[in-house]
């Protein structure tokens, strides 16, 4: 604000990995005030515990509606998972009925042919969950970057000052 820059989105995104009795309080623990927060997120490395993900999503969605702020899962995933229905069972199912604008999976590390590192949080060709990912991808509830309109080409006859 001091330099007159106003094209930032300020987000708060606490770690929420388990089922908590005070989920709302945990989401608001470091809340700086409504005037400072544009986006409410949570990092949720819930593993295969869909109860934790569902519970935290429910509270996140309710808080989002109360505060009139968009919300989403800013980081999630299960390292080196081998669950065939991970995408529809552990990610998509808990999201159903929640007003969550985005879910971001943690990274997949590049592994050269001679490495045996299993550091991945998302699908890759040939993974046991690849077919399930394609099912999730095809559902009307999911939206991927390829589904979005071109937002980065300046419209004709528009001048930015």
Residue ranges and their predicted role:
Residues 26-51, 106:
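Aromatic- and acid-rich polysaccharide-binding/catalytic face
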Residues 14-32, 51-63, 85-94:
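Alpha-helical scaffolding within the catalytic cores
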Residues 1-8, 33, 63-68, 147-157:
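A structural motif corresponding to the C-terminal end of an alpha-helix
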Residues 1-25, 69-82, 105:
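Aromatic-lined carbohydrate-recognition surfaces of secreted/lumenal glycan-active proteins
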Residues 69-161:
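Substrate-binding cleft of secreted/luminal carbohydrate-active enzymes
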Residues 42-63, 67-69, 81:
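Substrate-binding surface in catalytic domains of secreted glycosidases
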Residues 35-39, 68, 99:
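Glycine-enriched alpha-helix->loop->beta-strand junction motifs that scaffold or abut catalytic
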């Amino acid at each position: 604000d001091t330099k007159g820059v106003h094209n930032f989105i300020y987000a708060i995104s606490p770690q929420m990995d388990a089922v908590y009795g005070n989920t709302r309080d945990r989401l608001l623990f470091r809340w700086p005030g409504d005037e400072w927060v544009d986006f409410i997120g949570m990092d949720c490395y819930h593993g295969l515990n869909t109860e934790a993900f569902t519970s935290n999503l429910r509270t996140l969605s309710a808080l989002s509606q109360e505060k009139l702020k968009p919300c989403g899962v800013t980081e999630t995933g299960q390292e080196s998972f081998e669950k065939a229905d991970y995408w529809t069972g552990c990610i998509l199912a808990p999201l159903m009925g929640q007003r969550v604008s985005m879910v971001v999976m943690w990274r997949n590390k590049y592994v050269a042919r001679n490495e045996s590192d299993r550091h991945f949080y998302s699908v890759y060709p040939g993974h046991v969950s690849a077919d399930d990912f394609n099912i999730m991808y095809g559902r009307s509830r999911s939206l991927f970057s390829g589904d979005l309109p071109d937002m980065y080409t300046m419209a004709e006859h528009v001048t930015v000052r």
